């Protein structure tokens, strides 16, 4: 007798072993038709999986997140099937699920063209309509390797040969195609109804640039056409908001091959940067942080003591001078500990909060670089809090309050918080980890926020809180972190004199709110589609005259606003006013002031707000007050 407990708490009993599909059918024909897989005691399995003992079972359908993953994984295999059908000489490699879709890497003698993608997608649709059953068989490693060698699939054979000889291998087949996979997969290809191939890109075999370059075909798959249409619309909007395109259009920055992963900031882009930095500087100063500056280049011995030289060496830029090795800092923390160590610290000095807009460099691979979002040279709004164990909860509460307030000011109202918990390999005792994790939970609870816990995702030296902001398109970006560190203070000899005159290690909290300034500016640009709020806008106001006779008034008006701290310019060119308005509208300037003879004579201005909103004619002082109220919260 096999007892199966369902998610609603009910128990079904069967006199003999049953498959997931048979359980679904016994519940009802609708569920049998909808079933894509199952979850047996939390493990995702195929509908063909046999249940021969008492278990908890959930039937997975396309209404479940796991169901969508199964669909996407199966669609990746359908893609490989179609490619092999159309291009038999192509070699298949790997095809995983990724955010919003999947990809599959192929080795082929020539580049796939857009026309090829159309043919492949059409063939996928034809194969899906055949509704061919998907079967699974388990074989030995050697049998699987021999099979793929026999059909000339050298990459698959290489993958299999890297698996321990004692492991069994799952092979999935539909029609004339067989692939290696952990699964699970849909029961038949007819379940794959909504998909689209997106693009082709280059990729290296096993992610190593020394290996052969492959062709990676990206695709997306969904349960409903409306969902796919919404996703494709979001991609169109994302393309319009692409910070690289807007950076060029708005003359904010550029990048070039002579300095890969580094940014050339133009005047307007640097003005935007300064608004963010000065705002952040004011907020951390108000929160009791002390701003410091640490060297960009430090001796190898310090990085060895911190552990970075041993564990992070490949990502560090290094140099040598006078027979000494140095590293250009990839992070600020060791330098901050040096400042803490410079002098005897008492418990009365704590908490000590050191902040730095620290310039860091990391040797990211050239293929990973992406505009402002992934760079080699960047500045962090970094800070480290040195405190006692009794203080770390209150410090965590204060940081969370500050971070959430900052995100709100920048226009991000939707923030997801994640708490990464202890990994298997870790420093410190279970008792220390219990206190650290519970302390962060208590801090988040006190702040009235909800969070998701990620078991095993913490660093080996402590648990971490992550802040993921959602932009206008619903995309999630991890920006802020609060990382408890139980290792670095000991490695670098940080200590303070406790109340009983003993020497103790401080608790060290690594924290950042925006993270990389470059990346955060890229997120900001895309979130606001380049139309920055007035307090952030590189140029807040442009004053335009209609004719030469108003030039002097327009110039004096701009000078008056400039003295009030407004970022303003006067456009006195001998051009049609409609031309000037259009040009500055494309520059996304928040306020355009137009002056003609009437405005000059009455000492007024005609005001147009961004978006073509006509605010009418008003006295100069009235406009100044409007602008002041627009920006005062943030300045």
From Swiss-Prot:
Residues 242-533 are annotated as: Catalytic. Pfam families: HGTP_anticodon, TGS, tRNA-synt_2b, tRNA_SAD. Its EC number is 6.1.1.3. GO terms for cellular component: cytosol. Its main location: cytoplasm. Residues 1-61 form the TGS domain. The keyword Magnesium does not apply. GO terms for molecular function: ATP binding; metal ion binding; threonine-tRNA ligase activity; tRNA binding. Its cofactor is Zn(2+). It comes from the Bacteria. One of its GO terms (biological process) is threonyl-tRNA aminoacylation. InterPro entries: aa-tRNA-synt_IIb, aa-tRNA-synth_II, aa-tRNA-synth_II/BPL/LPL, Anticodon-bd, Anticodon-bd_dom_sf, Beta-grasp_dom_sf, TGS, TGS-like. Coiled coil: none annotated. Disulfide bonds: none annotated. It catalyses: tRNA(Thr) + L-threonine + ATP = L-threonyl-tRNA(Thr) + AMP + diphosphate + H(+). Binds 1 zinc ion per subunit. Zn(2+) binds at residues 333, 384, 510. Keywords: Aminoacyl-tRNA synthetase, ATP-binding, Cytoplasm, Ligase, Metal-binding, Nucleotide-binding, Protein biosynthesis, RNA-binding, tRNA-binding, Zinc. It is an enzyme of class 6 (ligase). It is found in: Cytoplasm. Homodimer. Belongs to the class-II aminoacyl-tRNA synthetase family. Catalyzes the attachment of threonine to tRNA(Thr) in a two-step reaction: L-threonine is first activated by ATP to form Thr-AMP and then transferred to the acceptor end of tRNA(Thr). Also edits incorrectly charged L-seryl-tRNA(Thr). This is Threonine--tRNA ligase. It comes from Paraburkholderia phymatum (strain DSM 17167 / CIP 108236 / LMG 21445 / STM815).
């Amino acid at each position: 007798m096999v007892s199966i407990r369902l998610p609603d708490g009910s128990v079904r009993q069967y006199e003999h072993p049953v498959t997931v599909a048979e359980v679904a059918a016994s519940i009802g024909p609708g569920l049998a038709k909808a079933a894509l897989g199952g979850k047996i005691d939390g493990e995702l399995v195929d509908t063909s999986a046999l249940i021969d003992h008492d278990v908890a079972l959930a039937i997975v359908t396309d209404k479940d997140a796991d169901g969508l993953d199964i669909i996407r994984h199966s669609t990746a295999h359908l893609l490989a099937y179609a490619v092999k059908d159309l291009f038999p000489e192509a070699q298949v490699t790997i095809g995983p699920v990724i955010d919003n879709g999947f990809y599959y890497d192929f080795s082929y003698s020539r580049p796939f063209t857009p026309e090829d993608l159309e043919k492949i997608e059409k063939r996928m649709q034809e194969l899906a309509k055949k509704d061919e059953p998907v079967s699974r068989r388990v074989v030995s490693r050697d049998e699987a390797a021999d099979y793929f060698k026999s059909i000339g699939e050298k990459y698959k054979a290489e993958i299999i040969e890297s698996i321990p000889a004692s492991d069994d291998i799952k092979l999935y087949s539909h029609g004339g195609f067989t692939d290696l996979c952990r699964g699970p997969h849909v029961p038949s290809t007819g379940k794959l109804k909504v998909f689209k191939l997106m693009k082709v890109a280059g990729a290296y075999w096993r992610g190593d640039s020394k290996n052969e370059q492959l062709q990676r075909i990206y695709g997306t798959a969904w349960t409903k056409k409306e969902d796919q249409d919404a996703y494709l619309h979001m991609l169109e909007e994302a393309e319009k908001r692409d910070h690289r395109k807007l950076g060029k259009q708005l003359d904010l920055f550029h990048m070039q091959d002579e300095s890969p992963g580094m940014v050339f900031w133009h005047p307007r882009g640097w003005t935007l940067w300064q608004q963010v930095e000065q705002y952040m500087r004011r907020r951390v100063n108000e929160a009791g942080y002390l701003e410091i500056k640490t060297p960009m280049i430090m001796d190898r011995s310090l990085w060895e003591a911190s552990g970075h030289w041993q564990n992070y060496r490949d990502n560090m830029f290094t140099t040598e001078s006078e027979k000494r090795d140095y590293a250009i800092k990839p992070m600020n923390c060791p330098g901050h500990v040096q400042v803490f160590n410079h002098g005897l610290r008492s418990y009365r000095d704590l908490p000590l909060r050191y902040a730095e807009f620290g310039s860091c460099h990391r040797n990211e691979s050239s293929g990973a670089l992406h505009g402002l979002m992934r760079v080699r040279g960047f500045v962090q709004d970094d800070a480290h809090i040195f405190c006692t164990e009794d203080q770390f909860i209150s410090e965590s509460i204060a940081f969370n309050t500050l971070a959430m307030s900052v995100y709100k000011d920048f226009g991000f109202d939707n923030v997801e918080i994640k708490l990464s918990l202890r990994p298997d390999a870790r420093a410190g005792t279970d008792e220390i980890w219990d206190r650290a994790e519970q302390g962060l939970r208590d801090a988040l609870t006190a702040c009235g926020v909800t969070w998701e816990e990620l078991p095993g995702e913490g660093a080996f030296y402590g648990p971490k809180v992550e802040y993921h902001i959602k932009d206008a398109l619903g995309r999630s970006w991890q920006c802020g972190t609060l990382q408890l560190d139980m290792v670095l203070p000991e490695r670098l000899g940080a200590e303070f004199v406790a109340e009983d005159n003993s020497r103790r290690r401080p608790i060290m909290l690594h924290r950042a709110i925006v993270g990389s300034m470059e990346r955060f500016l890229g997120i900001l640009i895309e979130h606001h589609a380049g139309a920055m709020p007035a307090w952030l806008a590189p140029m807040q106001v442009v004053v335009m005259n209609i004719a030469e006779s108003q030039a002097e008034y327009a110039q004096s008006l701009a000078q008056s606003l400039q003295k009030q701290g407004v970022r303003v310019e006067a456009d006195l060119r001998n051009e049609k006013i409609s031309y000037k308005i259009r040009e500055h509208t494309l520059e996304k300037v928040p306020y355009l002031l137009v002056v003609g003879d009437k405005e000059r004579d009455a000492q007024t201005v005609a005001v147009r707000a961004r978006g073509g909103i006509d605010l009418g004619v008003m006295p100069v002082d009235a406009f100044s007050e409007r602008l002041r109220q627009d920006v005062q919260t943030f300045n």
